[in-house]
Amino acid sequence: MQIWVDADACPNVIKEVLFRAADRTQMQVTLVANQTIKVPPSRFISTLRVAAGFDVADNEIVRSVESGDLVITADIPLASEVIEKGGIALNPRGERYTPDTIRERLNMRDFMDTMRASGIQTGGPSTLNQRDRQQFANELDKWLQQVRKS
């Protein structure tokens, strides 16, 4: 099992948590992006650069992920495909996606798109804070412990 990261949009503070976890647990972490991603030297951390384009990184992650792998992403359609393949999807705020939360998020996204299309300014997500970072680290640790037990 390994960890895949939708790295183009993953906050640096979350990448740092993942880098430390990779070395601490000797778990392979692969960052997939359409640009060069700077990573610390480690035999447990790798990058996979894909061509620029819509969903190219997402498609590579879906192609590569195996049952039980963890994928870090804020992309709801990607999370849905990961779960369909038997993977685990976790967003950078520490929310573990389920089929129910994905359905809820897709409905909300569609609603917000409709609001924006009608001229209403909706704003974006709040800035990632220390509580979000801690929630992410806690959920990552839960997954790592489950992997060690299996």
Curated annotation (Swiss-Prot):
Q: Which family is it part of? A: Belongs to the UPF0178 family.
The organism named in the record is Pectobacterium atrosepticum (strain SCRI 1043 / ATCC BAA-672)
According to UniProt, the name of this protein is: UPF0178 protein ECA0873
InterPro entries listed in its UniProt record = UPF0178
The family database entries (CDD domains) matched by this protein are listed as:
PIN_YqxD-like
